Design a protein with these regions (language model features):
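Glycine-enriched alpha-helix->loop->beta-strand junction motifs that scaffold or abut catalytic
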Residues: 37-39, 110-116, 135-142, 159-167, ...
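Glycine-rich phosphate-binding active-site loops on the catalytic face of alpha/beta enzymes
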Residues: 39-50, 115-119, 124, 169-175, ...
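Catalytic cores of alpha/beta
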Residues: 23-33, 149-159, 201, 205-221
Length: 254
């Protein structure tokens, strides 16, 4: 579904302010990312205990929940974005969010509004089937995360991967890092040996130089905390900064 053009995936976590100005900013931020080269959008549904996230995105989750963001409001956002946004979109959230909404109800609604898949970082490979079965029923991909681990485990996860593989660049939580030392090329080779599927690298990528290096070894890069930080720093005025940032990342990997 995600094809071979996958390169830049911005992660957008919304702050949850309910004023009209903030609503417009959220729409504009996503559209700015797409207009400046994003091949896929990852939308976060906030959760009170986002264990895979570093302080920047944890803070965004807290602000979103405090501001009244709900799963249904995120679905409404996606429905409105789909009037003109055609690139793939996936959710990043946690198992309890889906459980509390109801797995069947969540997947059905996600498909209805135009989502393409979801990432559940706290669901281990061995426990994914109850989500994957329902997701497949509604045409959604449950995206697999592969962290630096044994060759056997990477191969096992890769065989059943759908959509694209989220290659975790570093152990730990999300957040900007000064350097990435994991041998991403070797990880991607192991995945490709099992299945012809796009591989995107995330966790820690924040500079054009890092993006260029990672994109040379994989099919795409996932940028999260750096974009969320722009939203946090500039608030309703963040859109031009997102435009400039996404363009710089895209230009680095063309």
């Amino acid at each position: 579904m995600f094809g071979k053009t996958l390169k830049t995936i911005p992660k957008v976590i919304h702050t949850g302010r309910t004023r009209l100005r903030a609503e417009r900013t959220r729409f504009a931020a996503v559209r700015a990312a797409v207009a400046n080269g994003a091949d896929l959008i990852e939308l976060g549904i906030p959760f009170s205990d986002p264990t895979a996230e570093g302080p920047v995105i944890q803070g965004a989750n807290i602000r979103a929940l405090s501001g009244g963001v709900t799963t249904d409001k995120i679905f409404d956002l996606v429905r409105d974005l789909r009037t003109d946004i055609t690139v793939p979109m996936v959710f990043m959230t946690y198992a309890n969010v889906v459980f509390s909404y109801g797995i069947e109800r969540f997947c059905k609604r996600a498909a209805e509004v135009g989502m393409d898949g979801m990432i559940l970082p706290d669901v281990p490979f061995e426990e994914k089937e109850e989500f994957a079965f329902v997701a497949e029923k509604y045409g959604l991909d449950l995206i697999s995360l592969i962290a630096p681990t044994s060759h056997e485990r990477i191969s096992m996860i890769a065989k059943e991967a759908e959509g694209f593989v989220y290659c975790v660049s570093s152990l730990g939580v999300t957040g900007m890092r000064s350097q990435i030392t994991t041998d991403i090329g070797a990880m991607v080779e192991l995945v490709k040996a099992q299945k012809d599927i796009p591989c995107a690298v995330g966790f820690g990528i924040s500079t054009p130089e890092q993006a260029k290096k990672m994109a040379a070894q994989a099919d795409g890069v996932i940028v999260g905390s750096a974009i969320v930080k722009l939203c946090e720093t500039h608030g309703a005025d963040c859109v031009p900064y997102i435009k400039e940032y996404v363009k710089s990342m895209k230009d680095a990997i063309r």
